[in-house]
C-alpha cells in the first residue's frame, strides 16, 4: 500500500501539470455530486428537529368534490378535524400532529415596546412528539395549556434574546398579534431548511377546529404529519385512512373527500407543491439520475484523456514490468491503485468545496414558495454535512471516477506487446 502511495506521488512530481489538472477535475466533479447529495440529505434525511422523517407520512392537500355535480370542486389543505376523524383512530399511528405553515406575526413586550416580526405557527401537543426540539428552558405545550385566561406559547432562543436579552424567559408575558401570551418554553433556533418544524413562535390552535359541523370542517389550512411505529406500518396506515375516508364520505350529503393518493412519504411531501396536482416522483428521480450521470461522465471522459497521456509516457516502464513477469491484470490493478490516490486527493478537495458551495448557495438551494421571506436563518445541520453516508458516497463516487478515467487507458496500455512497449519512443 505504501509503495503504491509513493509511486503515485512520484508520478505527481514527474507530471505536476497533468496531475494538478487531474486532481482539480476530480475535485470539480465531486463538488457538484456531493452538493447534490448534501442537499438531498438536508431535505429528506432524519435530521434534527425532523428526526422522524423516515417514519412519517404526510397530508398537505385535500380535494372536496360534489357527489352529484362533479364540476363542483374545492382544492385546499386538510384540517385538524380530518386528522381526528380519519387518522388518530388508526392503531398503527404512534402520534400525529396538525400544524399551520409558519406565517408572519408581530410580537412585543407586554407594554408594547420592542416590537419584532416573527414567524409563528399554530399546532397541537402531539407536535412535540413528532418533532424533536432542543429546549433551553421550560417545556413543550400540552393539552393542559389549552384554554385558560392567557395563551401559552413556546419561542425560539433568538426571539427570547431580542425581547429580554436572555433565554431565561419562562413565565414572561408578551403580546403576540396584540394578544397577551405567556412563555412556557424556549427552544434552540430551528433552521428554515426544516420544512415542517420551522417557526420562531409556536402556539396551540383552538379546540373548535377539531369539531365537525359539515363537509367544510375537513378543510382547514393545516399540514398533517403522521408518525408510524415503523415504516413497515405505512401500508396499514394508508389502508386505515382510506377506510375512514370512505366511512366519512358515506355520511356526507353534498360533497365527498378525495385525499388524492396521500399520504405522502417525505420525498413526495417536500415536492407536493400544488393542492390539485401530486408530485411526479419518477420524473424527480430521473432528473437526479441524469444529473449524476452527466456529472460523472463528462469529467471522467476528460480525465480519461489525461490518464491516456500519462500512460503514453509510461509505456516503456510497463514493458519492463511485463518482461519481468507482471501480468496485464496486475499492471491494471497497480495503475488503478496509483490513480486512486490522486482521485482521493481530488475527492477530499471536492468534498471541502462542496461544503463551501452548499453553504454559500444555501438560501437559493432551499428557498421555496412556502419559506420565501421568512425571518429565520438557512443554517445547515452538521449531521447532514458530516454524516457517514456523505463520506461513503464521496468515496464511492471517487472509485467510479477512478475506474472510468483510468480503467480504459490502463487496459489499452497493457494490451501492447513487450517489444512494442520497449521500443516506444
Regions picked out by a protein language model, each given a short descriptive name:
Residues 2-3, 10, 14, 247-291, ...:
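Membrane-helix entry/capping segments
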Residues 124-140, 151-278:
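Mid-to-C-terminal secondary-structure elements
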